[in-house]
């Protein structure tokens, strides 16, 4: 019988990228059409949100079982009904969701090229890997940063893997200089920087929201300055923390519990799951909330997106302007919110 995880991985690999293109093209087309024919754009964007729900349905098992990421798995699962609900609200006249739709289009335009254009992916991944290595050196360590195939070859030699098995292992990742190689008590440990480790996903989210709202470029630039560079820098810190913790096995906390929780039999992976999946991802949520606050302070227009998101997730209305004590955005940019506020 086929391994369920392998089945999920095969389905994801086959449909994720084509679905992503359909999602981005649909949102982009709908956002452009909005300038000329809002009602026809509404229909197209409602369909785009439906496809977006399918996209997240495919991502959920990938994150939960293949990547073994609790935070991303749950987030993807929640995104399925949330996307359908956004489409429902947009269909019934919640015009502020045009802003959120434009944001999704802009996010995709930023993110997808790094995901599918190999030279761009290689440049970003290797740049982040080099800067992570520099960060590790600041801690007084001398990391070994090598191409993945070389790391796979070294691993195969140490573990006594056969030539065919080693060659197959070397094909797991692209031939980028993006892998930190450690040996702990004679056992090889590798930490490979992938596109998901570059922070491009989070940066694309903020870039998309900033681009989607209608506001002066000067304030958009300030919002960009307090979000994108901060995310990039903190992501380097995150990679340094994970590489050092995993490579040196510094995070061997409650190994039996962690191995059970993440479904692994390799005790050395405990440090990785604790450092990345538990500590780093939990702190990332806190950091993104703080950055959202900074962006809202500089660009109050994004409050409509934040308030709509909170309404969609909780079903309750929130007054972000009062809660964060920020100036109200230009009334001329106001739209009908998801909860109906702003409707004339």
Residue map of PLM features:
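Hydrophobic N-terminal alpha-helices or hydrophobic patches in metabolic proteins across all domains
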Residues: 1-344
């Amino acid at each position: 019988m086929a391994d369920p995880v392998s089945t999920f991985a095969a389905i994801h690999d086959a449909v994720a990228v084509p679905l992503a293109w359909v999602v981005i093209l649909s949102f982009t087309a709908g956002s452009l059409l909005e300038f000329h024919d809002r009602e026809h754009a509404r229909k197209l964007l409602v369909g785009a949100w439906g496809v977006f729900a399918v996209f997240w349905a495919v991502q959920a098992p990938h994150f939960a079982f293949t990547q073994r990421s609790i935070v991303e798995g749950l987030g993807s699962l929640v995104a399925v009904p949330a996307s359908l609900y956004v489409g429902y609200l947009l269909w019934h006249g919640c015009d502020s969701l045009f802003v959120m739709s434009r944001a999704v289009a802009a996010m995709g335009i930023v993110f997808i090229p790094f995901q599918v254009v190999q030279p761009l992916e290689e440049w970003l991944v290797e740049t982040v890997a080099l800067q992570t290595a520099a960060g590790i050196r600041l801690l007084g360590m001398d990391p070994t940063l090598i191409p993945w195939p070389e790391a796979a070859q070294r691993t195969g030699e140490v573990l006594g893997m056969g030539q065919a098995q080693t060659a197959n292992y070397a094909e797991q990742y692209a031939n980028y200089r993006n892998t930190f190689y450690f040996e702990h008590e004679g056992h090889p440990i590798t930490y490979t920087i992938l596109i998901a480790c570059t922070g491009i996903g989070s940066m694309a989210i903020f870039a998309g929201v900033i681009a989607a709202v209608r506001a002066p470029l000067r304030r958009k630039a300030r919002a960009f300055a307090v979000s994108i560079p901060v995310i990039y820098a903190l992501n380097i810190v995150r990679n340094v923390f994970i590489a050092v913790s995993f490579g040196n096995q510094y995070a061997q906390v409650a190994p039996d519990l962690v191995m059970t929780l993440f479904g692994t039999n390799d005790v050395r992976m405990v440090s990785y799951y604790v450092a990345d999946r538990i500590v780093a991802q939990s702190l990332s949520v806190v950091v993104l909330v703080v950055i959202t606050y900074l962006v809202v302070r500089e660009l109050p227009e994004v409050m409509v997106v934040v308030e709509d998101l909170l309404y969609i997730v909780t079903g309750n209305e929130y007054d972000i302007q009062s809660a964060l004590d920020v100036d109200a955005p230009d009334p001329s940019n106001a739209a009908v919110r998801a909860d109906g506020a702003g409707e004339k």
